């Protein structure tokens, strides 16, 4: 377990603790429990707070359970997609929920596991958070029609040469299907001379988002989160697509006027804000944190306070 403690560093940990400083009692929902780093720190500081932890990855959840064993009786762990499980928890617990945390990153344990397919040297082409899910990266890369590959590379990877890459992948797989992440990574490297970013980075991002329906799940969650009352919502994102969804949702939550934009005059009483944005700009890791944990460098945290 000490090895896990050393391997896994929770991103923006002190900033998360600061965001939840007002919480004393009630329930905190950690929508992306992972290895339980954030939850463990919060429970340590908040003796009267209870936790609901959610994660798709049952292996990670077992590790989190072991790390949280000193808080036995104060937490309940749920398996599955966080949008669905959060909605269920909100229906059951309602206003007892005082804090919600969503960390959209992939854990170091998942990234470094060569059997999971998240890194460029993996012996698998998988990328599933939920190992019971039918869709994996191999099916996407070796089976998706070219037009479908173009779409996910464009929409989820924001890749400029999305058509070229999709067609090159299709040409190669027709001769020899891709067998693992290392095979795909090396092939993508042969197509690009980009020195600033590994040629496979954005393709891997796009495929991972597709395999795990990441953006759709985030959209569903943000819509459901509108029903929170007197709760603090903290979301950590790791790329521009996620951050844009969170930023726009928070702006929407904070709108007083809900009239049609084309209206000449407000007719809605102009008092419909669900609360206030607590972060005018996203909170990012300090230079020291980035030095100690390079994978934190793209993290952005936004916080919203819902009113009663």
Swiss-Prot record:
First-listed, main subcellular location of the protein, grouped into a coarse class: cytoplasm
List where in the cell it is found: Cytoplasm
The record's listing under InterPro entries reads: RsmH, SAM-dep_MeTrfase_MraW_recog, SAM-dependent_MTases_sf
Catalytic activity reads:
cytidine(1402) in 16S rRNA + S-adenosyl-L-methionine = N(4)-methylcytidine(1402) in 16S rRNA + S-adenosyl-L-homocysteine + H(+)
The entry's S-adenosyl-L-methionine-binding residues are: 36-38, 55, 82, 103, 110
Q: Name one GO molecular function term.
A: rRNA (cytosine-N4-)-methyltransferase activity
| SUPFAM superfamilies xrefs | Putative methyltransferase TM0872, insert domain, S-adenosyl-L-methionine-dependent methyltransferases
Q: Which GO terms describe its cellular component?
A: cytoplasm
Pfam assignment, any one:
Methyltransf_5
Top enzyme class: transferase
Q: Quote the EC number.
A: 2.1.1.199
Which keywords does this chain's UniProt record carry? Cytoplasm, Methyltransferase, rRNA processing, S-adenosyl-L-methionine, Transferase
Q: Which GO terms describe its biological process?
A: rRNA base methylation
Q: What does this protein do?
A: Specifically methylates the N4 position of cytidine in position 1402 (C1402) of 16S rRNA.
Which NCBIfam families does the UniProt entry name for this protein?
A: 16S rRNA (cytosine(1402)-N(4))-methyltransferase RsmH
Concerning its family, UniProt says: Belongs to the methyltransferase superfamily. RsmH family.
User: What is the protein's given name?
Assistant: Ribosomal RNA small subunit methyltransferase H
Source organism (scientific name):
Helicobacter pylori (strain J99 / ATCC 700824) (Campylobacter pylori J99)
């Amino acid at each position: 377990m000490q090895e896990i403690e050393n391997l896994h560093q929770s991103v923006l940990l002190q900033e998360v603790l600061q965001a939840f400083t007002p919480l004393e009692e009630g329930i905190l929902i950690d929508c992306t429990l992972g290895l339980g780093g954030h939850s463990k720190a919060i429970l340590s500081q908040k003796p009267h707070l209870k936790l609901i932890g959610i994660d798709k990855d049952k292996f990670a959840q077992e590790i989190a359970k072991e790390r949280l064993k000193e808080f036995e009786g104060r937490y309940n762990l749920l398996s599955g997609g966080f949008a669905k499980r959060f909605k269920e928890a909100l229906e059951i617990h309602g206003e007892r929920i005082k804090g919600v945390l969503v960390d959209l990153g992939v854990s170091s344990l998942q990234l470094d596991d060569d059997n999971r397919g998240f890194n460029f040297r993996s012996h698998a082409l998988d990328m599933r958070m939920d190992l019971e899910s039918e869709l994996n990266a191999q099916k996407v890369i070796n089976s998706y029609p070219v037009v479908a590959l173009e779409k996910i590379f464009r929409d989820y990877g924001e890749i400029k040469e999305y058509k070229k890459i999709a067609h090159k992948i299709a040409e190669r797989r027709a001769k020899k299907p891709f067998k693992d992440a290392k095979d795909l990574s090396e092939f993508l490297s042969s197509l690009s001379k980009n020195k600033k970013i590994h040629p496979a980075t954005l393709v891997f991002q796009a495929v991972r988002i597709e395999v795990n329906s990441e953006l759709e799940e985030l959209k569903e969650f943000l819509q459901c989160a509108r029903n929170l009352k007197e709760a603090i919502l903290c979301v950590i994102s790791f790329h521009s697509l996620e951050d844009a969804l969170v930023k726009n949702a928070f702006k929407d939550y904070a709108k007083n006027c809900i009239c049609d934009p084309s209206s000449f005059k407000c007719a809605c009483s102009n008092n419909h804000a669900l609360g206030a944005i607590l972060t005018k700009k996203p909170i990012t890791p300090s230079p020291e944190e980035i030095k100690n944990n390079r994978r934190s460098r793209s993290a952005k945290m936004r916080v919203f306070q819902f009113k009663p």
